[in-house]
Design a protein with these regions (language model features):
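Compositionally biased, non-globular sequence tracts
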Residues: 1-48
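Extracellular interaction modules
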Residues: 19-23, 112, 364-368
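Charged, compositionally biased non-catalytic regions
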Residues: 41-69
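Extracellular adhesion/carbohydrate-recognition regions
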Residues: 56, 66-157, 243-286, 369-372
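Short aromatic-cysteine micro-motif
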Residues: 101-228
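C-terminal, surface-exposed recognition/capping segments
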Residues: 167, 195, 200-205, 211, ...
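Short secondary-structure boundary/capping segments
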Residues: 174-179, 240, 249-251
């Protein structure tokens, strides 16, 4: 058992976890980011000795039209999370055939937001609240509803990462040629075993958050969003498969606690162009006509059949952006929730475009975790 101690301003955060190691680099970077944030907020710190600043500066930067930054955001318990800021983007900036409409990740409660914040790391558990910190054991074995409630409990604007937010990161990664690698083979990247993370304990196939190389991020830089491929699947709020139909929350309204996404909740609706799943022919098919399914189907995206991937599907990364990765959906009667990204044991099946739509609402597993996201309400001026 080890403690993670991080000094921020005059306080010291002590987080207990069953991890056995913490990357010195990640700890230094976290300390630097915390000090920078406090400095910008008016605190005085000596920032002359920035850990590995030259390495960070030398990393390839995102495309010029992608404006983002790593920041520290504190929740209502006064504990920080390391977050990545993403500025407003439109569909035509993200994928082929996209219109000039704002990507839905930036439309919340009918209002367009200039920026949103996404956890840099899959979240860990500190006193029942989720946090984005490096070198921690991912919080798993939780239902999607409990994960959502834990995120909402952090305060106004905090929420479980949504389907549009995941789609945003997947599309950015594909467009910029930086599809993330990750822990897809017992702590290593299946295609290059020199890429590895720190195991949560000796012999474990799971890795501590953010301990892989820069290629394990959405933009292949050390300051990117980590671990979107492999290690643990991640819940996303605001998408489900109900009696074979793809149902979603409007825009990014899944970020709002008042959006009722319970089993019979009023927050669910069909896509703008309704889309159904056909699993009756041995492959996953997307169709605009409802069919009767009696089975689950799964395979690689390259084998999925669809006459046309709609703009709404592309917004959520429901298309073969990574042809070799897994897409599996239960199209039978009932409700199935989605997880994304894959876990530690799937080899080439897993990546940021991986989609598994087969789990009932109450399902929990050691290989399913989550991360929080945040937006600042426009009334918070």
């Amino acid at each position: 058992m080890a403690n993670l101690k991080i000094k921020i301003a005059d306080n010291e955060l002590v987080a207990d976890g069953d991890h056995k190691a913490l990357s010195e680099y990640k700890a230094s970077f976290l300390d630097f980011v915390a000090k920078r944030d406090a400095f910008l907020a008016g605190e005085r710190f000596e920032l002359t000795e920035v850990p590995r600043e030259e390495v960070i500066a030398e990393n390839p930067q995102p495309a010029p039209n992608v404006k983002d930054e790593v920041v520290v955001i504190y929740d209502n318990a006064g504990i920080p999370s390391i977050m990545r800021r993403f500025s407003l983007m439109r569909n035509n900036e993200l994928f082929e055939g996209g219109s000039t409409v704002e990507h839905p990740a930036f439309v919340i409660g009918g209002e367009v937001y200039d920026e949103i914040y996404i956890s840099v790391y899959p979240n860990c558990n500190i006193n029942g609240k989720p946090y984005s910190l490096p070198g921690m054991k991912p919080w798993t074995n939780v239902t999607i509803d409990d994960a959502a409630n834990a995120c909402f409990s952090k305060g106004d604007g905090w929420h479980l990462m949504t389907a549009p937010e995941w789609g945003l990161l997947a599309n950015i990664s594909l467009k910029n040629g930086t599809l993330p690698h990750g822990n897809t083979d017992c702590g290593h990247y299946h295609a290059d075993h020199s890429e590895k993370g720190i195991p949560i304990e000796s012999g474990s196939p799971y890795t501590l958050t953010g301990t892989g190389p820069a290629t394990w991020t959405h933009d292949h830089t050390v300051t990117g969003v980590h671990d979107l491929c492999g290690n643990v699947y991640e819940f996303v709020r605001g998408i489900r498969f109900k009696d074979g139909e793809i149902q979603i929350a409007t825009d990014n309204d899944a970020a709002l606690p008042e959006t009722d996404l319970s089993k019979n909740g009023s927050g669910w609706s069909s896509m703008a162009e309704p889309m159904f799943v056909d699993t009756s022919h041995g492959v996953v098919r997307f169709t605009k006509e409802k069919v009767e399914n009696d089975t689950y189907e799964g395979g690689r995206w390259k084998d999925v059949e669809c006459s046309e991937y709609t703009e709404g599907m592309k917004e959520l990364a429901i298309y073969p952006g990574e042809p070799e990765v897994f897409c599996g959906i239960d199209g039978t009667e009932g409700e199935r929730l989605a997880v994304r990204g894959g876990y530690w044991g799937g080899s080439s099946n897993y990546g940021v475009f991986c989609l598994n739509g087969s789990n009932p609402r109450a399902y929990t597993y050691t290989s399913i975790g989550f991360r929080s996201a945040y937006f600042k309400r426009k009334t918070d001026n």
